[in-house]
């Protein structure tokens, strides 16, 4: 199903009906609205103006549109900030962050909790049973603009409380953090500060607990809104729109309080911002890197326990990346189908019409500011027609499971130990390899059941909790575990049995030394799949297991016991490809070697093939299959769908 | 005429007479002094020490030197700052900027207005009728060190007042800024903050109004001094020394209150700092880029309504650029003649003698700290002799007019939309092409009359006010309008008729989509002048006009109706050259193709040819002309002057 | 002799005896401890817990280990900071720096002086006569994390007092700083601020005095502790562990109050951080640049007036550089011998066992966190055995003396005048050339006697005080003086006789102009040793001396009178090599041309040869010598020692 984001408060009332009719005519079913409308609803404290929203919802109902109503808490009005200036967040540099953009509130502020309670309860009471309203979006893009972590006095108080609840006694905290180091022993929770502007680097356990706390605060704030909504909106779903390449927040935890996950998909903006070589940024500037959207579809499908929406889909140039190219013709359609192939229940575009004013005036929509349709309009028209003709079977499980961990991102952010070590880069490089191999991936948090997967990939899991170890133990496929896994305890200490810590139960080896390498320093390795040059990270392993791959100085780089493998280095793309291909073959997953711009995705018996490249490619379909969309010859930026049984 | 900057307060009194005699002997007529002398004049509050300056001026008078007296407000003394700490400016990061350098005051400070009134009135009363004093310089280099924009409480108050005066009602402001976006609706002007340290980017209309306000505050402060001076200094001119490559301030507006403009010309420092490829920085390290000084001469001649001085001319290495090379021998003479050829009424060098102490001790002067003459001394001696032998006809109009707009710089600073889009880079690349074509350029603000110019160039003019449109309509030459022109209303909104907005009256086309491109992503275009590869910026145009140049995907890049042309992309230097050459030929301007280091400038019937390059070049003079300086063979870093009729 | 750093407070008491026994078994004699143990000693204010340290020291005594006891002032406990929050330092940005790392105190804080007096006196009283305690280390790495320079109110007060003591009258200060420039004349010392956050750059004399003050404050604080210790610890030495490539602090001055110097040697970390081309960083990533440790050995031997220790020697990967590679096998042994060859009295490793917790958990030690020995353990075992078999003669004087000046580093930090001008880079490039020439270097502060050295090198000495001039006058070898020497007075002014100022007594020439060059702008020079291309810096010299080397435009680059030479440019490595080789030959020092990775060091009749390279090299030993370690064929990362008479 398709939807769109709409801001009735931006347009004259006489245009609403016409817009809603045009949405329906285009084939849209959902409309999201309201998420930045606080000052339109409450222009002065307590004087609620419901009228316009009443009329919008009635009109939507009349036109057959289902409304997702956003709570407006991402943008507290100026009067609220002036009344409670302490709700403004404080950045890592200790500077109060001002009103004038959005997300100008601290998750720990008691005053903001009260104001949130007031506006959300009012909203839910008034519209929770409105027939047009099918669900709610809580707030908008939690954490955007670096807002998960705040350094204000309210956060300091809340952090101290969080620590007290976690540790019980200050001695337990001292032991966990190793505060005996550098004389940091605390006598009371009230002595603990927020870890910023320290003279030397802060204690890593202190930082990790603070990052956990900050993520927890967002979750608690979301939960606070969810509870208010549930009370007043029977039968309505509640979701939130997560972001791409964003790790400050643990989406798996937060989504436990949601009905499903949603995310905002801007493939071109992400491609310009992600750490790719410049030539790849240029190569994919108009299509987005072929795995960027797919990765997040899989991630948020996991986060949503199988259910997800794309709440904001890029329909044209955006305004917030360093460079904002125009999508190649066909890409909006392709991205939509990629989302659907991955199981998206709804793809909702951002936005119905480009606003001619304010911060996002350069972000394109379905319609231009002069009310004429944009390119994307016609591409979506086509998707809507195609969709109505194509019955979608439910998506099954993927052959590959990937374990993704927000906490891992925090651990390595705190302690990279090598400037090039980036958690998301490692995860994405594993993910990309499977896409090139034509293999679908399901993404799980640590501890999720992994049974039934032919191949389980753990790019890196520094902290291995009991449930994660159990899940890995019970996996019945091949399990490949990446470097630095098991290298820390939950307290951010080196485990007593040294790395990989608890994983030694599965992989009897010890990592006795690690090193990070400067750019240009490559180690050569050799094995059954050829020779590979490695950089970034290397580990020394003591074990009785014979290495499957060795550095030329003799050190092992890949070890295996039974179905468990351990990779003791940052893998080069070439090694990763050879290794994953080999394991996939062993697991009977029938990997392919797809052309550079081609990607596949199955949904039940349907196979979707997407051509992100600039040349025609042949669909890797068995002879004689029936094509439901397109045909064997896939033009650039186009797709084909066929049925395999 | 020639002059020099002198700091009598830096030297023992017994040296003054000798210095003044030496200046006259060198052929100098003007001496600027006093602009940093506040604490020498008023070492403690209210205790004025006029004696030394009395003696300096009498001596100057005796020696036949005409004095330009600076008001000393760029450097309030420490006692003043201690008495009124609130005059210290606050930077964008919210930090109070301290005493210890210069320009440590806020233009909005009421206390500083009072202190300014006091010292300037005293100065004007005492010296406004002194026979040696021929004019005043207000303050020094307004805006230097990022001081146009201040974020202090006084500025906040003043900004609120400025908005109230502009908009009248807060509803008008809300509508203009589109504050309905992100719930930023204000109820009162007292709610509006300065746009900094916001969590997400601030509203662009808010930013633009703040930048306008900040520029206005400087103008008002200058006007405040001008009024004080006019009252007490009959017949004396008033000017200000503007800076190079500086856009925070609108010089056209400020100069309306001056008798003429002046600027400070440091070709080597600017060349090291401007955004050139490193190889060009090296190429021009000892000469300055050949168009840097010329561009500013033309700009400030326009700002000065035809009249300008060079108030500070670089005579040797400076101290403030990342690299400070020595000018090639001959360059001080060449720069001087370039200024004169552009119509400079006076070229005044900075400074008479290198100070052995304090911040600028590494900045060379005419004399070394040991009182010996520097290289520049002898070059200027030669210029003075040459000048006295060469009668200078008045300068006429140039064949090309270029429209320059400070507001355009602000718009693109606020909303580059592509990291490489820089207003000055675009303007300078147009300007440089005409210099290479041997064509003089006059520079105007938008709205100035453009009649009589064979070619009018508008590199980019995002906000097209009524008077600018009228002036363009009444131009009688060819008019080339660059990308993003007409793309914003005065309110910083997309115009209702979409870009190029009001320009559609002249150019019936619509820009329906724009994009910025990452470095390395080039689009190919083809047309009558060849094939060109473009990056940075592209626009999609809907129009019935046939394109003169097309991208290889068919999109038009250059459109024309009658004498108006629209360029829908960031031009490559190659295209710009071909296009401007072709238009100049059509306009009958007889463009040439000058060698890389050669530049021409006419002043009446005189043609000046400047050789910035390291090789001898031949002067492009018709056969048989009379050479007034040099001859047909121009050595490196030298010049020739001949008469054409 | 060998030692190790140990943190008993990090380990269970039952392990101490076992650890001490293992240290002795390994051949270690010294153990440093206690320097971060304040909160272990005084967990709450006034409640001292001596018991554990009593037992540690008694145990050390019993096991035959000599203890170096650190004063714990680098890490004041949280309760102390909470009681006196004003001890926290303030950074250049004006931000209070928080508790949570280490070195969170201001050297000017009266409260911290009191607390220091209390804890150091208690410690000295209790342990100053303990038989295990042979000496004290004051604090730890003074200045680490940018803590020499603080911008707090206490420092402002102290700086004003320091200025008053230095100048006596404010007029003297005004004259010295040239405050007449930019109206900065002060009426009272109480008007002077700390030089930061100024609108334009601060006055250089102001900055230099502040940098001197800041260095003096550290020295005074150290002296304060030394006095407390001397009173209570008869016969115990007092030292401090200095850092590498660190210039904020003048180590020569501070060490006047110590018995000898110590320093912390981390060759790999320094190599990753120093300004080397990336390819050299890669080349030496696992060995350290071959001259990094040697340079500091020579520097701190000079600082220690002939006596120094390595207090912390890197034994494996560290955690604080951008990249932290593993040392090549053999390097820990090689580094140890390099230190000993340079005269180190003790080499003490950091640390006995890798801590599994807190900030330095990724820094390797002799033992892993699981109590197993690391690679370094076995290398040191070998060194200990070799040491006991090799009688070490005293080290003699080197043939080359190098003059090193912290103040020079400050002058050029304040006024680089060219972005690439870095004092340490210049010094290190001179030093490296002599290492390649097989010539030892002694390092002195300006003013030290230089008699007996065949060659004296002054890379750059901007401020030449009377005693420095005298020492150079009395040198009896060749003296090469580098660019910008003599270019400033003690007041940070250009000397009246212009540069090289007082050095004109030795070198009758005047530097009449200087310039810095952008990268890529090279000047060609030619002379007896060939042609060389130069960048970065060039000077113009007026003199009757004929140049030994000329730029191709005729300007001289190298001048000589008698045994004094002046170099008027930033030297290229090629020129430096040719020049130093030639001078060394003239001086009869018998320079060699060593292979790239080979280095020599004499200690009495012993010659040590170190192979930092990856290939076997031949020892440059005369035929027939006796090898005491290794032999003529030196494997990679190995050494040889032979006797020459
Ligand atoms: Zn907060
Ligand atoms: Zn202000
Ligand atoms: Zn301080």
Swiss-Prot record, chains A, B, C:
Matches recorded under SUPFAM superfamilies: (Trans)glycosidases, Class I glutamine amidotransferase-like, Glycosyl hydrolase domain
List of catalytic residues: 141 (proton donor), 312 (nucleophile)
Temperature dependency: Optimum temperature is 70 degrees Celsius with ONPG as substrate. Stable for several months at 4 or -20 degrees Celsius in the presence of 10% glycerol. Activity increases continuously from 30 to 90 degrees Celsius and drops dramatically at higher temperatures. Retains 50% of its initial activity after 1 hour incubation at 70 degrees Celsius. Retains 90% and 50% of activity after 30 minutes of incubation at 70 and 80 degrees Celsius, respectively. The residual activity of the enzyme decreases to an undetectable level after heating for 30 minutes at 90 degrees Celsius.
GO biological process, alphabetically ordered: galactose metabolic process
Catalytic activity: Hydrolysis of terminal non-reducing beta-D-galactose residues in beta-D-galactosides
Key words, A-Z: Glycosidase, Hydrolase, Metal-binding, Zinc
Annotated Zn(2+) binding sites: 106, 150, 152, 155
Enzyme class, first EC level, given as a word: hydrolase
pH dependence: Optimum pH is 5.0 with ONPG as substrate.
Any one GO molecular function term: metal ion binding
A Pfam short name: Glyco_hydro_42M
Keyword presence, Hydrolase: yes
Enzyme Commission no: 3.2.1.23
InterPro entries: Beta_galactosidase_C, Beta_galactosidase_Trimer, Class_I_gatase-like, Glyco_hydro_42, Glyco_hydro_42_N, Glyco_hydro_b, Glycoside_hydrolase_SF
PANTHER family cross-referenced by the UniProt entry: BETA-GALACTOSIDASE GANA, BETA-GALACTOSIDASE YESZ
Family statement drawn from the similarity comment of this UniProt entry: Belongs to the glycosyl hydrolase 42 family.
Primary role: Hydrolyzes chromogen 5-bromo-4-chloro-3-indolyl-beta-D-galactopyranoside (X-gal), o-nitrophenyl-beta-D-galactopyranoside (ONPG) and lactose.
Protein's recorded name: Beta-galactosidase BgaA
């Amino acid at each position: 199903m398709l939807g769109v984001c709409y801001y009735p408060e931006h347009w004259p009332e006489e245009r609403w009906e016409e817009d809603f009719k045009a949405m329906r005519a285009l084939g849209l079913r959902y409309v999201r609205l309201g998420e930045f409308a606080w000052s339109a609803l409450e222009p002065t404290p307590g004087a609620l103006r419901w009228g316009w929203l009443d009329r919008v919802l009635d009109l939507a109902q009349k036109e057959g549109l289902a409304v997702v109503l956003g709570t407006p808490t991402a943008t507290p009005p100026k009067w609220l900030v002036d009344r409670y200036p302490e709700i403004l967040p404080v950045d890592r540099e200790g500077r109060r962050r001002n009103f004038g953009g959005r997300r100008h509130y601290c998750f720990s502020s008691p005053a903001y909790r009260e104001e949130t309670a007031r506006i959300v309860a009012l909203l839910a009471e008034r519209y929770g049973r409105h027939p047009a309203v099918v669900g709610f979006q809580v707030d908008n893009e939690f954490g955007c603009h670096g807002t998960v972590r705040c350094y204000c006095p309210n956060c300091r108080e809340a952090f101290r409380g969080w620590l007290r609840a976690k540790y019980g006694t200050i001695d337990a905290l001292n032991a966990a953090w190793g505060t005996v180091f550098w004389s940091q022993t605390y006598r009371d929770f009230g002595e603990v500060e927020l870890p910023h502007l320290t003279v030397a680097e802060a204690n890593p356990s202190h930082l990790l607990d603070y990052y956990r706390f900050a993520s927890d605060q967002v979750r608690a704030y979301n939960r606070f809104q969810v509870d208010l909504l549930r009370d007043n909106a029977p039968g309505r779903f509640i979701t939130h729109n997560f972001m791409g390449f964003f790790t400050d927040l643990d989406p798996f935890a937060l989504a436990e309080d949601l009905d499903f996950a949603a995310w905002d998909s801007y493939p071109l903006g992400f491609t310009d911002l992600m750490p790719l070589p410049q030539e790849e940024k240029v190569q994919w500037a108009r299509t987005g890197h072929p795995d960027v959207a797919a990765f997040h579809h899989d991630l948020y499908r996991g986060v949503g326990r199988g259910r997800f929406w794309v709440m904001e889909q890029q329909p044209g140039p955006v305004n917030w990346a360093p460079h904002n190219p125009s999508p190649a013709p066909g890409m909006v359609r392709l991205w939509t189908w990629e989302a659907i192939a991955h199981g998206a229940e709804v793809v909702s575009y951002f936005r119905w019409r480009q606003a001619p004013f304010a911060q996002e005036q350069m972000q394109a929509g379905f319609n231009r500011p002069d009310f004429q349709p944009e390119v994307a309009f016609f591409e979506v028209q086509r998707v809507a027609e195609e969709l109505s003709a194509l019955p979608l079977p439910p998506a099954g499980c993927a052959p590959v499971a990937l374990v993704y961990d927000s906490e891992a991102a925090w651990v390595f952010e705190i302690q990279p130990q090598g400037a090039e070590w980036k958690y998301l880069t490692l995860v994405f490089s594993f993910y990309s390899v499977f896409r090139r191999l034509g293999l679908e991936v399901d993404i799980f948090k640590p501890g999720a059941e992994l049974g039934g997967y032919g191949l389980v990939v753990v790019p890196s899991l520094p902290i291995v909790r009991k449930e994660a170890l159990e899940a890995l133990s019970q996996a019945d496929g091949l399990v490949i575990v990446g470097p630095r896994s098991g290298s820390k305890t939950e307290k951010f200490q080196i485990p007593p049995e040294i790395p990989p810590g608890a994983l030694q139960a599965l992989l009897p080896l010890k990592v006795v030394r690690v090193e990070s390498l400067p750019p240009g320093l490559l180690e050569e390795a050799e094995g059954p799949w050829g020779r590979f040059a490695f950089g970034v990270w290397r580990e020394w392993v003591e074990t009785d297991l014979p290495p499957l791959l060795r550095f030329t100085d003799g050190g092992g780089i890949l070890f295996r016991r039974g179905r468990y493998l351990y990779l003791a280095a940052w893998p080069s793309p070439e090694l990763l490809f050879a290794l994953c291909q080999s394991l996939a073959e062993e697991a009977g997953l029938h990997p392919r070697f797809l052309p550079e711009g081609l990607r596949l995705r199955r949904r039940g018996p349907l196979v979707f093939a997407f051509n992100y490249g600039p040349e025609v490619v042949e669909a890797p379909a068995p002879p004689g299959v029936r094509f439901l969309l397109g045909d064997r010859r896939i033009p650039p930026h186009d797709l084909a769908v066929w049925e395999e049984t």
